[in-house]
Every structure is written in structure tokens, then in C-alpha cells.
Swiss-Prot record:
This is Chaperonin GroEL. It is an enzyme of class 5 (isomerase). It holds the Pfam family Cpn60_TCP1. Its EC number is 5.6.1.7. GO terms for biological process: protein refolding. ATP binds at T29, L30, G31, P32, D86, G87, T88, T89, T90, G413, N476, A477, A478, D492. SUPFAM superfamilies: GroEL apical domain-like (SSF52029), GroEL equatorial domain-like (SSF48592), GroEL-intermediate domain like (SSF54849).
Length: 538
């Protein structure tokens, strides 16, 4: 296929047009008075959203050179979303400002490489200063503030704060679509895995169709159990203690299953069997997790352990176990807290090393189950369109909150970037490097300017006043007042602000140092579209 090439100023201008088209569509959503954008969907109703990355991903421009510019800025939003989970609109606004200011200077004869070095120097100082003014997040109230700002909804803020309080910072919080109109929180405390009882005769509560074991022993093995002879020694010891037994095995079948069911029905003793969760190596790891959580051991022939020689000392214990048709939940395992902590740290180390998204998800689940539990936020709304929009907002809020817990918070509403303005301005640089620093200074004014414009105010006036205010004081666009941003609960996660700035600078530097752009030549339609006369045919 033939290619078309544009060089230097012509190439950069074409890309800038694409950058502007995408950024102008995204930046109308910034701030408390930001508007929505409606996205056409090939199937189903249109999607209404104010999520920067969702809008950026939808934009495809006809001109291939403009499209390249748009795609580069979409990459800024996407990368920021991957790292911090929020701040995609801020990143887009920063990137547009840096590219626009940079191209003006390149057109005036500045050296792009010098500008690039200046941008990198300024961003490095800005990131250090953001870390210096960052405050650690404390308590449920702070978490609720971060979530409420991101979702623009106080009720959502409270829900997320409660979820994080219940399952801990490492807990898994998932979003599901609710059948009703309201958004509510459902928390599963303890460790839950998706395997239920192997026989319905094992249930203890016929109304709820579940087996509830109070203070049970837990036998954990990776073997298939079919002979009752293997289980007899340990069963006799458990019966003497007068406590129920949960058996987690690859499978329980045949004579062993029949004996357990008959004794349960006769009331001799209460035992429930469930299949081991997961497959292959993941199954071994999950069984080991359960063993550590409950203070038991995995009975495995690989480790030289046999079922018939198992004693009560090798069994795990828990305050309560609830087994349904599809799930098993272990509450308050009796494991040693130091061993559980060590296991959590081991999984965290694996999380940092893994490159697979699937493995990361599974490790995160295991971590959550050991650390506290799983919370499900069931998102409700009156219409499907509202439901999708609300779910996206809550997802952003959740990511934002996690980022805040990780790296702390700074004043929101673009104020934090303005608070570090003077430190960046004090960087010693000469020539084109100094120009690069000035480009970053102009860009860090842009979020405040845009938030003010979206609120129907003159951005430049707000920016100038902010430069002279003492640190932490900012403009609350929702009320039109000047307040202490952190006290007023208007905060941004440091990680979100930092990632937005770093990713915007990275892509801006790439665009400024572009000297040629190559794209496919559009194919002309050679076919003759005029249909021949049908000659009077019916």
C-alpha cells in the first residue's frame, strides 16, 4: 500500500489538530461543573459519560495525520488510567497545553531536544514537590472525601469508605449491576471460594439450603477420597471431640461419601465435604492459603503425608463455616497471625513480579481472601444508560481511593499543581531548556483554568489569584468560594496528579521531537458505482 509523508511543521500542525479535537471533547468534563459527552454505540442506547478515557478511546478521526495526534493523547489518558485509575481528563488537558505551547516555540525556531530536556527537568522537580506536600490518608472520613470528589456523589463516597473499612486496603471490591434502583454494599467477610457441598444431604438449614458448621475442624487434602478406611482414624478423633468437620478434597465419592451422608442423617456426626478450589498449581497455592488461614496443614502425598496417619493436630479450625450449593465461606480462621502476614507479603512480592493481567487478578483475589474479605457494590439506576454512566463513575472513584491510600492526597481542583508553581519556576535553566520549563509552568495552570471555564467563570482571573494565595487555599468551583481545599474535603490522590503530569510530559516530548509522519494513502474507489440499465426488467 502506498504511503503519504508529511515533514516538520506541516506534520506537527496536522498532529496538533488531532490533539485539539480529542482534548476539546474530553476537557468539557473536568471539574464539579463539567458536562457530559454522548457516545454513539452501534448497538443499544448511546453511552452518556464524563469519564475521560472512555471518551478518548471512542474518538477516531478521518484524516490519518490528525488521527495519530488524537491517538497519542488517548494513550496519555489510557496510561494514566492503567497506573492510577483516574485523572484521565487532567492528563489530557496537561498534554494538550504542553503540545500546543511547545509547537509554538518549535515553530519560532527553538530546538525540540532542548525543550524536551527542559520539560523533563521541570516534571522531575514537580513530582518531587508533589510528594513533599502529599498528606497520608487517615480514617474513613478522608477515604469518603476522595471517593465523593471522584464520583461527584457523597453517597458513593460513603459506600466506598465503608467497603474499604470492612475488607481492608488489600480487600477486593468489585462492581456489579443491580436489578433495583438503589446502589448498595454487600460484604463477604472471611475467605470465600467458589465450591459448594458435594451432596445436598449435608445441609443443616433446609430453608436457606446451606450447611452451617460452628467451630469446626477442617481437613485439607489434594487427594481424591473414595475409601472410608482412609478417613476413619481422623473421623474417630473428631467424633470424640464432638465437633463438626469440613473436608476440602479434590473430590469425595463412593463409599466415603455414602458413609458421611448416612452418619449425618443418623445424627452420629456432622461432616460436610467440598471440592478444592482452583486447578493445577493454583489449587495447591489456594489449599496452602486455606491451611495457613485456619492453622492446619495440607495433607498431600507430595509432602509425604497420608490421610490414614492424619491426627487432629494437622486439622485447621475456624469459628464458623457456611457452605451453600456454590460457595464455601470460612469465617475467623484460627491460623497464626505471623504466618498469615508472611503469606500476604509473599503474595504481594509475586504481584509485583507478574506481567500477566490474569495472574495479577488471581493473586489480588488470594490476597484479599487472606487479608479480610470481598465487598460487592451493587450499582442501581432507573435506566440502562444511567446505570452504565454511574458504574463508570464509581469505578473511577474506587480506583482514585485506592491510589489515595497508596500515596496520600494533595489539595484538589488543580490547586496542588499551582502550589508547586514557584518551585518549578525557580529551576535554573538556559536557552531552550528554560523554554521547556516555561511550557510546563503554562501547562500546570491549565487544569484550574479549565475547571473555572466549565463553571462559567474566567479562568485567567482564578489562576492569577491562586498564584498569590497561600498553599492549600484554592477555588471551589462547585460553590464559587475560596477555601482551604483539604479542610473542605476537595482532594486528589497524589498518585493521580503525579501520573497525569508524567504521562502528559512523556507524550508531549514525543510530539515535539517528531520531524516526519508517515500514514497510509487512502485508496480511491475504482469501481464504477453507476449500475447498468436493467433493460426494462421487472
Amino acid at each position: 500500500m502506498a504511503k503519504q509523508i508529511k515533514f516538520s511543521e506541516e506534520a506537527r500542525r496536522a498532529m496538533l489538530r488531532g490533539v485539539d479535537k480529542l482534548a476539546d471533547a474530553v476537557k468539557v468534563t473536568l471539574g464539579p461543573k463539567g458536562r457530559n459527552v454522548v457516545l454513539e454505540k452501534k448497538f443499544g442506547s448511546p453511552l452518556i459519560t464524563n469519564d475521560g478515557v472512555t471518551i478518548a478511546k471512542e474518538i477516531e478521526l478521518e484524516d490519518p495525520f490528525e488521527n495519530m495526534g488524537a491517538k497519542l493523547v488517548a494513550e496519555v489518558a489510557s496510561k494514566t488510567n492503567d497506573i492510577a485509575g483516574d485523572g484521565t481528563t487532567t492528563a489530557t488537558v496537561l498534554a494538550q497545553a504542553m503540545i500546543r505551547e511547545g509547537l509554538k516555540n518549535v515553530a519560532a525556531g527553538a530546538n525540540p531536544m532542548g525543550i524536551r530536556r527542559g520539560i523533563e527537568k521541570a516534571v522531575a522537580v514537580a513530582v518531587e514537590e508533589l510528594k513533599a506536600i502529599s498528606k497520608p490518608i487517615k480514617g474513613k472520613e478522608s477515604i469518603a472525601q476522595v471517593a465523593a470528589i471522584s464520583a461527584a456523589d457523597e453517597e458513593v463516597g460513603q459506600l466506598i469508605a465503608e467497603a474499604m473499612e470492612r475488607v481492608g486496603n488489600d480487600g477486593v471490591i468489585t462492581l456489579e449491576e443491580s436489578k433495583g434502583f438503589t446502589t448498595e454494599l454487600d460484604v463477604v467477610e472471611g475467605m470465600q471460594f467458589d465450591r459448594g457441598y458435594v451432596s445436598p444431604y449435608m445441609i443443616t438449614d433446609t430453608e436457606k439450603m446451606e450447611a452451617v458448621l460452628e467451630n469446626p475442624y477442617i481437613l485439607i487434602t489434594d487427594k481424591k477420597v473414595s475409601s472410608i478406611q482412609e478417613l476413619l482414624p481422623v473421623l474417630e478423633q473428631v467424633v470424640q471431640q464432638g465437633r463438626p468437620l469440613l473436608i476440602i478434597a479434590e473430590d469425595v465419592e463412593g463409599e466415603a461419601l455414602a458413609t458421611l451422608v448416612v452418619n449425618k442423617l443418623r445424627g452420629t456426626f456432622n461432616a460436610v465435604a467440598v471440592k478444592a478450589p482452583g486447578f493445577g498449581d493454583r489449587r495447591k497455592a489456594m489449599l496452602e492459603d486455606i491451611a495457613i488461614l485456619t492453622g492446619g496443614e495440607v495433607i498431600s502425598e507430595e509432602l509425604g503425608r497420608e490421610l490414614k496417619s492424619t491426627t487432629i493436630a494437622s486439622l485447621g479450625r475456624a469459628a464458623k463455616v457456611v457452605v451453600t450449593k456454590e460457595t464455601t465461606t470460612i469465617v475467623e480462621g484460627a491460623g497464626d497471625s505471623e504466618r498469615i502476614k508472611a503469606r500476604i507479603n509473599q503474595i504481594r512480592a509475586q504481584l509485583e513480579e507478574t506481567t500477566s493481567e490474569f495472574d495479577r487478578e488471581k493473586l489480588q483475589e488470594r490476597l484479599a481472601k487472606l487479608a479480610g474479605g470481598v465487598a460487592v457494590i451493587k450499582v442501581g439506576a432507573a435506566t440502562e444508560t444511567e446505570l452504565k454512566e454511574r458504574k463508570l463513575r464509581i469505578e473511577d472513584a474506587l480506583n482514585s481511593t485506592r491510589a489515595a491510600v497508596e500515596e496520600g492526597i494533595v489539595a484538589g481542583g488543580g490547586t496542588a499543581l499551582m502550589n508547586i508553581y514557584n518551585k518549578v519556576a525557580a529551576i535554573e535553566a538556559e536557552g531552550d531548556e528554560a523554554t521547556g520549563v516555561k511550557i510546563v509552568l503554562r501547562a500546570i495552570e491549565e487544569p484550574v483554568r479549565q475547571i473555572a471555564q466549565n463553571a462559567g467563570l474566567e479562568g485567567s482571573i482564578i489562576v492569577e489569584r491562586l498564584k498569590n494565595e497561600k498553599p492549600g487555599i484554592g477555588f471551589n468551583a462547585a460553590t464559587g468560594e475560596w477555601v482551604d481545599m483539604i479542610e473542605a474535603g476537595i482532594v486528589d490522590p497524589t498518585k493521580v496528579t503525579r501520573s497525569a503530569l508524567q504521562n502528559a510530559a512523556s507524550v508531549a516530548a514525543m510530539v515535539l521531537t517528531t520531524e516526519a509522519v508517515v500514514a497510509d494513502k487512502p485508496e480511491e474507489n475504482k469501481g464504477n458505482n453507476n449500475m447498468p440499465d436493467m433493460g426494462g426488467m421487472m
